[in-house]
Amino acid sequence: MTSIAISSGSFDPITLGHLDIIKRGAKVFDEVYVVVLNNSSKKPFFSVEERLELIREATKDIPNVKVDSHSGLLVEYAKMRNANAILRGLRAVSDFEYEMQITSMNRKLDESIETFFIMTNNQYSFLSSSIVKEVARYGGSVVDLVPPIVERALKEKFKTPLK
């Protein structure tokens, strides 16, 4: 049986923290789908198409990673892909409560899909897409926070020179 995991998020933009979780998940599962979900409570900075392209470029050297988007329930997408796992990263205890609520709802919707949590490496425990955008907006260096393709895309959007 092939083990298939879904790593989902808004990825607006993808960070090295996201990439760390994806790479580690790709070592455990046969296939990992990185899925851009449309979060109705967030106003995206990058379009879905831009985010997909940034993720594809950032994960191009991980052969068992596929990139996609979805507008519905994550559990429905997982069923469509015959996935048996949802992969989630935890940065801090504060993430756990929210993730536990989502996991409980996903289990209620489909008990056959398990959620696996991976603790973020300490070097990324503070990192979020929101922080990255804030630093880039004011011309700060994001070189140690995002893949090079994302750094270039942020500089282009904010019209700031590369540092």
From Swiss-Prot:
Pathway: Cofactor biosynthesis; coenzyme A biosynthesis; CoA from (R)-pantothenate: step 4/5. Its main location: cytoplasm. InterPro entries: Cyt_trans-like, PPAT, Rossmann-like_a/b/a_fold. Its EC number is 2.7.7.3. It comes from the Bacteria. It catalyses: (R)-4'-phosphopantetheine + ATP + H(+) = 3'-dephospho-CoA + diphosphate. Its cofactor is Mg(2+). The record marks 18 as: Transition state stabilizer. It is found in: Cytoplasm. One of its GO terms (biological process) is coenzyme A biosynthetic process. The keyword ATP-binding applies. Keywords: ATP-binding, Coenzyme A biosynthesis, Cytoplasm, Magnesium, Nucleotide-binding, Nucleotidyltransferase, Transferase. It holds the Pfam family CTP_transf_like. GO terms for cellular component: cytoplasm. One of its GO terms (molecular function) is ATP binding. Substrate binds at residues 10, 42, 74, 88. ATP binds at residues 10-11, 18, 89-91, 99, 124-130. Reversibly transfers an adenylyl group from ATP to 4'-phosphopantetheine, yielding dephospho-CoA (dPCoA) and pyrophosphate. Homohexamer. Belongs to the bacterial CoaD family. HAMAP family: PPAT_bact. This is Phosphopantetheine adenylyltransferase. It comes from Bacillus mycoides (strain KBAB4). The lineage of its organism: Bacteria, Bacillati, Bacillota, Bacilli, Bacillales. The gene is coaD.
